[in-house]
Regions:
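Structured loop/turn residues at beta-strand edges in well-structured enzyme cores
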Residues: 1, 56, 87
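Conserved beta-alpha-beta core of the PfkB/ribokinase-like small-molecule kinase fold
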Residues: 6-82, 100
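Conserved phosphate-binding/catalytic region of the ribokinase-like
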Residues: 20, 44-53, 77-177
């Protein structure tokens, strides 16, 4: 069982909730919402006050380049991934846009390529799409590299149209060839 926590704001899931859920299954986090705070009618980027408590109970995290820098203070993706792992995260996925992504798991880095889209229509939801693909593959028992490649291929298909991801597994496999 995997609990994927994709919060909208930094206080959606307390450290206590995450700790409790971690006793019931694996915890996956998309860091984006933890780095936002609403003041009045405006949304502000913030550091994540409870990050160390929550990451200690996190199995998988997905961050992009900006998020990893806010959380760790580091600009190098590999160094940031190592820092997140040091804080307790078992699988660190860092998405790097058109440069692909890296995954750090069990002390090893996996370099995941980005697949070139036919055209870029809309990038909205690509992070969520990556998380969904990666988590689905891992739940099927696939390895880190294959899961990352599948997730990257899903993102390529997502870039090519607006709206939620609505392609098939066969569509994704065609991109991966």
């Amino acid at each position: 069982r995997v609990f994927h926590l994709g919060c909208l704001l930094s206080d959606d899931f307390s450290p206590e909730v995450v700790e409790y859920l971690s006793t019931k299954g694996r915890i996956s986090i998309d860091a984006q919402g933890y780095l936002r705070e609403v003041r009045g009618e405006k949304v502000f980027a913030i550091d994540w006050a409870d990050k160390r408590k929550i990451l200690a109970n996190t199995d998988i995290i997905k961050v992009n380049e900006h998020e990893m820098e806010v959380i760790t203070g580091l600009t190098d993706p590999r160094q940031a991934a190592l820092q997140l792992a040091e804080w307790g995260v078992k699988e660190v996925c860092v998405t790097l846009g058109s440069e692909g992504s890296i995954i750090l798991a069990e002390g090893k880095f996996y370099d995941i390529p980005a697949y070139k889209p036919k055209e870029i229509v809309d990038a909205t939801g690509c992070g969520d799409t990556y998380s969904a693909g990666y988590l689905w593959c891992r739940a099927q028992g696939m390895g880190y590299d294959e899961s990352g490649r599948f997730a990257a291929a899903m993102c390529t298909l997502k870039l090519e149209h607006t709206g939620p991801f609505d392609r098939t597994i066969d569509d994704v496999k065609r991109v991966m060839k």
